[in-house]
Amino acid sequence: MASSLTHPPPPPHLPSLNPKPNFTRRSLLLTSTATTLSFPSLSSSAIQPPNPTITDRIFMEFSLCPNYYLPNRTLGDTISTLCSDSTLLGRVILGLYGNLVPRTVSNFKSLCISNPNSNPNSSSYKNTLVHKVLPGQYFLAGRQGRPDRGEVRPPSYLPRNTETVDPKAFALTHSRPGIVSLSLSENDDEDEIKFDPEYRNVEFLITTGPGPCPQLDNKNIVFGTVLEGLDVITAIASTPTYQPGERIRQFNDLAEFFGDERAQNARAIWNRPLTTIYISDCGALEVTKPSLTPSLP
């Protein structure tokens, strides 16, 4: 009997795992077009440039007071009572960037238009000190504390400023004299005030020149510029300040190393003007039309 041989079916055809590509100019063009349509690139609309439009104008008048640190002052004396014969240093006009950092500008403006004479419990920059001057860099004002010491009453009623943690708020740089900035890295409010849950930072700095201050960039919020009165800023910057000797600095560094709190208290008077400079008046001015920041030297 003849037996028939059975043959197994042929294996299925498997495509090559690494087929040789067959590219043509047309296929490359179509692939490139499809990729462009499917994955749009980052455009200028995705990353918005800073908007330094001046939406608000503020005036500040700075004065010199010869009597503020007299030894015979009483406990109830304030700048308004001690400095009745002060000398006006000049008026400064500030332009604020309300579109870029609206909350920072709003809080700053609130303390400029507040009137402590009509409401003793309100917070205001009026009758507060320029408490620190760093020659060739900037000066600080708006330190919080006791009004009788020329400090700003803590403004716990202000809205919380969430721009301090918003990267977009740090877009502008301290590139020239006359930059107005919310002091964050240079803030020297006492820890007792900073640790209050209702703490609102209102300390500010103004760069004095002659050069830029790149060490302030990305650490403090630029929210305005000096429009008029740069000569007043220069006069404040030229005021003599208290500078400790090298031996005192070494002792202070050693005390800080060992955690002595008195080291920080001692540094509070470093760079303090030897002549009392204070904000004798401040308020808002009308803005007829928002404008871009002018170029300053």
Task: Annotate the PLM regions.
Residues 2-297:
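Cyclophilin-like peptidyl-prolyl cis-trans isomerases
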